[in-house]
Swiss-Prot record:
It is found in: Secreted. It comes from Tetraodon nigroviridis. Residues 1-20 form the signal peptide. This is Erythropoietin. It holds the Pfam family EPO_TPO.
Length: 180
């Protein structure tokens, strides 16, 4: 529920008609930490699930490992494209998981994960990070692999938020401005 509240606050701020300037940058990592905590809660719930919580077939997910030397050499748009492709892949994977899982308690975690992915995209928009949606299907996106279980998908989700998404937010130009 708190993820939905955070998302609604972001959307309301973004769509407010009297707002003469773009959404203020959301540089506070506590916002991302909140999404990570909820992802960890979903991962824990999945690990305790015994019935109705399987993935009917493997799904394409982003690689979560980061070679920091390679990451530092990428330009901002390449980093943004990689993270947004990963967020898109995760959203597709969660939508598929939703159709595979019959456990009602897990449905709420899956729905919350999808809302939080949309919220992370809204945070990126607030940082003036150009939106990117992959044109290819998931298998054609570079830097992917297949998750064969729901628990594996949730682990990828947590690691992606903790890794590449966090690095992109830390590097965001809008957050680098001196506030003196």
């Amino acid at each position: 529920m708190t993820g939905l509240l955070a998302f609604l606050l972001i959307v309301l701020e973004w769509t407010r008609p009297s707002l003469p300037s773009p959404l203020r940058p959301i540089c506070d990592l506590r916002v991302l930490n909140h999404f990570i905590k909820e992802a960890q809660d979903a991962e824990a719930a999945m690990k305790t699930c015994r019935e109705g919580c399987t993935l009917s077939e493997s799904v394409v997910v982003p690689q979560t490992t980061v070679d920091f030397d390679v990451w530092e050499k990428k330009n901002a748009s390449a980093k943004a494209e990689e993270v947004q492709s990963g967020l898109w892949l995760l959203q597709q994977a969660f939508n598929f998981l939703r159709t595979s899982v019959t456990n009602a308690a897990l449905h709420s975690h899956i729905d919350n994960a999808v809302r939080n992915l949309l919220s992370v995209n809204a945070v990126l928009r607030s940082l003036n990070i150009q939106e990117f949606t992959p044109q290819a299907n998931g298998a054609e996106i570079e830097g992917t692999w297949r998750a064969s279980s729901a628990a594996e998908l949730l682990q990828v989700y947590v690691n992606f938020l903790r890794g590449k998404a966090r690095l992109l937010l830390l590097d965001a130009q809008a957050c680098q401005q001196d506030v003196s």
